[in-house]
Design a protein with these regions (language model features):
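Short beta-strand "wing" residues that participate in macromolecule-binding interfaces
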Residues: 66
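Basic, amphipathic "hinge/linker" alpha-helix immediately C-terminal to the N-terminal HTH DNA-binding motif
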Residues: 73-94
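N-terminal helix-turn-helix DNA-binding core of bacterial DNA-binding proteins
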Residues: 7-50
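Basic amphipathic alpha-helical segments that dock to polyanions
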Residues: 51-58
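Glycine-centered, phosphate/nucleic-acid-interacting loop/turn motifs that mediate DNA/RNA or nucleotide
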Residues: 62
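Amphipathic alpha-helical dimerization/coiled-coil segments
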Residues: 87-117
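Short, Lys/Arg-enriched N-terminal segment that forms or immediately precedes the first helix
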Residues: 1-6
Length: 117
């Protein structure tokens, strides 16, 4: 994890996608990926394979739905929306990550032991 860009921990991409759809409404895969990149300040960069694998997984779990539509550039695209089950999962996952972040903040704030002579 020493790269300049962030490596995603298991489950974080799902949470990012669910939050993006909850905040922005229906979006196509490219739009979801770009929004995550923008909000992260380009710390998280997503390739097509990564985002579409996550979208398939979330759809299989019933957390998002998809329907075909037309994008801003008049191309056929699949648009994704968060479902009721997805909103419930988002609430649970967000609470978990907030607890974890709080624990990590406390751990990182712990003073280092001074070396003993």
């Amino acid at each position: 994890m020493g790269d300049s860009k962030l490596d995603l921990l298991q489950g974080t991409l799902d949470l990012m996608v669910l939050q993006t759809l909850a905040a922005m409404g229906s979006l196509h895969g490219y739009g979801i990926a770009r929004r995550i990149e923008q909000v992260s300040g380009d710390e998280v960069l997503l390739n097509q394979g990564t985002i579409y694998a996550a979208l398939v997984r979330l759809q299989q779990r019933g957390w998002i739905s998809a329907e075909w539509g037309t994008s801003d550039n008049n191309r056929k695209a699949k648009f994704y929306s968060i479902t009721k089950r997805g909103r419930k999962q988002l609430t649970e996952d967000a609470a978990y990550w907030q607890r974890l972040a709080s624990v990590m903040d406390r751990m990182l704030a712990m003073p280092e032991e001074e070396s003993k002579p």
